[in-house]
Amino acid sequence: MSTMLPTPRLLADGLKMVESGRWHDGRLWLAHWGSGEVIAVDLAGNKEVVAPGRNTMGWSLAWLSDGRLLVSGEELTRVEPYGSTVRHSAQGGNELAVDPADHVFVNGADFDFVGGGAPEPGWIRLIDEDGTARDVAGDIDFPNGMVVTPDGSTLVIAESFAGRLSAFDIGPDGALSGRRTWADGLGPDGICIDPEGGIWTQTADTAAHTGDDNAPAGAVVRVLDGGEITHRVETDLPCFSCALGGPDGRHLFLLCNEFEGVDQLEAVLSRRSARIYVTDVPF
């Protein structure tokens, strides 16, 4: 039996679509889809545009160890210390992850999801220091959020269409091997990992997945390697991304959006109905 977390409280609203939440430098940073902005939100709910993003859907954030911000999308860009934006790699993609050795991983799939294209298997690519990209994993069933375990040894990716978290060993050169299932039967999107190695991910027992109007609109659980679920929290909108942060790292931020299908994205964006919630966790 999992433990239910405290009811989440509203941190910020009035946003278009919120994704790729990351705690950085004392604030929650996120990709503000539909606005082309990277936004930072403090614990009082104050919002600030801190960097340029993308005018498209499907992009995210990560940082190199020296503090420079990476932004994915049609290409991978880097924000320099004095605010200028430069190309880091011509390789575009969706989600990003950077390990302690500064291996930069980007994922994506070669079909037009927003345009209703037929699904194709996705990939993970490693971006070398000179910006070149090489495949390190394939046959990913709609790649989404990625995290690196606290010891830097393992990359875990959300395969959204499969309802699965898959794990890979990270080699000294950034190569991935030893693919295995971390947990399945889920509804993963943007995920995060705590210092004890528990991954916080979306579930598949929500209204959108089940068609049950009595099911919660959104739910996030903490799942251990092997599939054991230890904690749960529910939201009144679908949760697209979650992030751990706060002064002691024990705030769980829940980035929630309306979703009525890709053909209704513009209508959803125009309503500015996205919300960010926060609750407390024991880790």
PLM features: what roles do these ranges have?
Residues 1-7, 45-49, 82-86, 127-134, ...:
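Beta-strand initiation motifs
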Residues 241-283:
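Blade-level signature of beta-propeller repeat domains, shared across WD40, Kelch, NHL, RCC1
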Residues 1-14, 43-45, 279-282:
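A short helix->beta-strand "capping" segment at the edge of beta-propeller domains
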Residues 168-174, 280-283:
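Short loop/turn segments immediately following beta-strands, especially the blade-tip
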Residues 33-34, 111-121, 160-163, 208-217, ...:
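Short, solvent-exposed loop/turn segments at conserved positions within beta-propeller repeat blades
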